[in-house]
Amino acid sequence: LIEQCLNTGYEDWSQLLPCDRALAVPSEAINPKHPYTKSIANSIGWQWRIPLQHRTGNGIVYCSKFSDDQAAADILINNLPSSALSDPKNLRFNTGKRKKIWNKNCLSVGLASGFMEPLESTSIHLIQSTIMRFFSLFPHKNDFRVEMNYFNNSIDEEFSSIRDFLILHYKLTTRDDSEL
């Protein structure tokens, strides 16, 4: 709705956050179960490992310019902590955000507003922040341009800050085994 009807536009951040693919695969549960997600850097991107009650969630995030799906799947499967429970599921995404999260009478929330990458689970925070910010500015009159402009400016700052935080993960590393 916000794109097809309102032509809001999308800011492409793929030059800043080049990872645009992920593969996800569950594996058998591991013990001991650690109460945290493990992020593991590798030569094509990074992997996640999330111990759950009855299985382990695993995935790899990478840039399609530097690796193909099969190479990523091989790295992922070879680094699983236990046997895979299914074939990897391929996920594709475009990093960036809507030019306006609130446009006229339409509010973009979650993946409709944008996506950076799953490294820090920032989408969960941005959903909550978007909803809370919108409710705090909820319009009580027909002309809500001031509230809408304030909302869009402040949420733009938040998206940009999170984007820059994610970029630091790649820019401050001393790794030299990857083009990322």
Across the structure, where does each feature detected by a protein language model lie?
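Short, solvent-exposed loop/turn elements at beta->coil junctions and helix N-caps
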Residues: 92-96
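Hydrophobic/aromatic beta-strand patches that form the interior of the parallel beta-sheet core
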Residues: 23, 89, 107-109
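Single, function-defining residue in the core of a domain
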Residues: 74, 98-103
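Predominantly flavin-linked oxidoreductase catalytic cores and closely associated redox partners
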Residues: 1-83, 131
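A conserved FAD-binding loop/helix module that cradles the flavin
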Residues: 115-135
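Flavin-binding catalytic cores
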Residues: 54-55, 63-90, 139-149, 153-159
